[in-house]
């Protein structure tokens, strides 16, 4: 994450590319009362904290002792003072008191302890600022928050203090003698950097092992910054790789060294020269002579120490990075040489040149646990004790150890933590950036990582270079005041981390053998198979042919949103760091999530103009151009264009451990959620070479859990078996039609049908409809079971989800009119079915397969005892997906007539096979009575299903009826009489009118509402015949009467008998009907928080970029979907399990067992060893106060990567409230909406903020005030 300074505004960008916060760099255009946000004041990103921080800087700048200081240095001092004031304040109100801020500040600054610690900082800062315009620059490493003295610019006072206080000059200069010889920018380009050099004079003022330092892991994560597409045209230094100044940001996991910029009189422009006697010309000839001698002596000592290891492991280093290699050497431990190898030097070495003619060496983030331990800091500072313990344990287990840093990144979806090893985040380009301004120096900003609950969200780490448009972070300064207890850290690009987090992260560090880096050069054959295990990609389970097919299709499946750039040459033989070596593309963009208009709730055109309301630098809401034209508050909206470009997020990357090349995670089919710190990642090309050389075997298929390994049910087995039989028959028909044998005709392979969700739900009847039929005792709710069924197909050895449908099953225990009814709610598919050929009947073969799945499901429901099925054939609109997120661009969305024809062909097949006995429309079956119908038609007889069309329409009609005036009611009564006379119906006149209005609404689109009869219905009473005997007309087709209606038929006059339109009457034949079975589900309940609702599943895919617009993305999305499915259910009993108590296999991916199965079967449950995660997190129970505080936070939080679980929950609740048709009405309604309104009312009663941003807060306050006034007037 980086910040860019444009026209006095510092804008911070999260990894998603969305602006998260904007603060004025100068001036106070808003008062604190207008922008108070008290919910996150414990964070540095708080607006209130930012205001007070800048006020502190303003006051400091007014003092004489700080007037000559650089502004950035004052900002860091102000930050530390602000943190101290916040921690020591009795309350937030006292901390926010701006009137007493100057007094409190002066009390701190005038204290003796503060002034004593600031003495040497002030001298160094002033000296640096005075000489910044004259002196060149060199970079010197700082070990553990301690700056090694520079050659000639260290003030004498600081040098003397270092000497008199017992500083070990050898230890203090060891790192400085071996700094990375990369020249900094010229003074005229970056003068501010020279003014920020601060020296810590003695050990007593050293900060603790920085709990405030941000994470910069040394794994394989790479971050693309703005300007990646213009590497050859920019003159700015790079910061995205290990050779950039990002290496100056300290790694809190490894306590690696940082770089600080120091001016000196002269320095050779030759890169890579050692500070030795042979290079005396590099050192200044005036002043600090003893210091120069110390540098030379230290260099000679380290060369002596490292000579033996240089000879033994010369292949790992180059001449250009000899100094960097020296920095890894440590004194003897237990009589042996130790070498710190956090990562291989060749992974990070290499350099890149810019237009100024200088080069930078790639430096490694060295793990300094051993150095820290040896230099005597662990005994003095409590924050380093975990490091000491880790090193002590490692020394006991191995004579030569290294630290393997891990970067736990939270997975909100499963509650797990996985290391961010090998990942890199691609940050999209900054939007609306002037190219001239892009060449200016940019100031570092507070690092904010994109950490969504279900997306690959990794923290920023070292990465290969290729990002020119960035600034050096080498001027960071760290100091502390041990009297006041403040950590005064000048790290603009870091976030605050507590000491507790530091301890926890260090406790996760795994120590391994340092000689493991030599295995890659020596092992071969069988021994190669015994190295680190794989498991991060499903490609390891593929054959060589499948791998080749997968690689061939990648070049054809790149998205149209790609950013074309020229192919860059590799550096020092390494692969191009900005190009995926699998697909050959650079930066690929995901399809942005759709924006909905806040007024009309329609999707805003992604390529057109729209308007946004900005609050605190973030987009609060968006409206379309049409609503903006009709809006009366146009001033508060800003016009924007094409959010398809501004909202798009770039694909993530991963680096191969073997060839060091970078690939898109999607191309590599890499699953970042199951990365094992001990596992290695090998790209497809390297793995294919190993397979061709017979050096390695692919994983066993059982170790990669795919669609076949999902739990089977009777429903899925029934559909699969029926589909397999029908495909065999269809293939034979194609062979006969083409005159070929069956083997010569292509067949369909690799299909898998699975039920991924089967959850019990309850549908609440909308209150107006319920009250309308209060006399008829209409039920208030309908229980049903929601099921999600998916179809997978093996495509080049990888599962791809092709088809999804959600159904609602109202069983025999459900009250009428939904008893024994099935509602086909949603159907969705993507066009990746293979082979793409025609069936024997002339339709597409994929259509044949989808029809057979639906017919198979209806057949299964019929056998279980269901009697009817309703379907609403409503096509989805563009970018408004039903189930699968983002469809291919080549797939056309069907219009209403096409979709209607598709369902009609389905029904014809079902009728032909006897699955459906009669096909009707909802209008003809219930709303349009025939002469044979002997019962009163009522709206209460229509099946009332969740998210169906007509229940919402009926509620709207009843709501409109309640709003009519008394004058209109007289007209309405006359209309009722006319309708009753015309239709000749009996019953409630209002019910008749409601049916009439529904009929008028459905008549023009009645073909879109199908009513399929799976069993015979009585033509007189319209009830299904579920048991006993029935009577069928011998002359008419499908004319059945139940036993009761047939008895009434015999008692009616002959002229009124069937058929009523003719004089000749038909005879009936008695048929004995077997009673229908109860609809009890034979399959177990399978609940999943991601798949129980199609809204939850769709949002889960949107949040995690599980898209299906290309085949490569469909493969990766399916892989992640399968991972979540396997990870959330027990592999033995297939029941939902508690993730905190799950037992997991370390070999088989996604193989998890619940605690009950493990207690029952133990180790015999699985062939491999199972391990239970010990540091599980207990689910948090929220109180009312938590919800109220979370409501305020969620209403102001526009960060898509917010890690607060309660914030995400409440945002989902708001989203549900917008879409819900049931809502909270009367004494019933949707229980989620009821909870939301109760929460809003409770908040409004307690809220005293006139400008509260919580939803409907002001409206509820006005409503309460009106009610209070009304009550007072009545009582008065």
From Swiss-Prot:
Coiled-coil regions listed: 953-973
Residues given in the record as Zn(2+) 2 binding sites: 1033, 1036, 1058, 1066
GO cellular component, one term: nucleus
Compartments, as annotated in UniProt: Nucleus
Zinc finger (ZZ-type): 1013-1076, 1125-1187
PROSITE patterns: CBP_P300_HAT, ZF_PHD_1, ZF_TAZ, ZF_ZZ_1, ZF_ZZ_2
Sorted UniProt keywords: Activator, Acyltransferase, Chromatin regulator, Coiled coil, Metal-binding, Nucleus, Repeat, Transcription, Transcription regulation, Transferase, Zinc, Zinc-finger
Zinc finger (PHD-type): 621-689
Region named Disordered: 391-421
Compositionally biased region (Polar residues): 396-413
GO biological process, one term: positive regulation of transcription by RNA polymerase II
Binding positions (acetyl-CoA): 827-829, 846-847, 902
EC number(s) stated in the UniProt entry for this protein: 2.3.1.48
Name of the protein in its database record: Probable histone acetyltransferase HAC-like 3
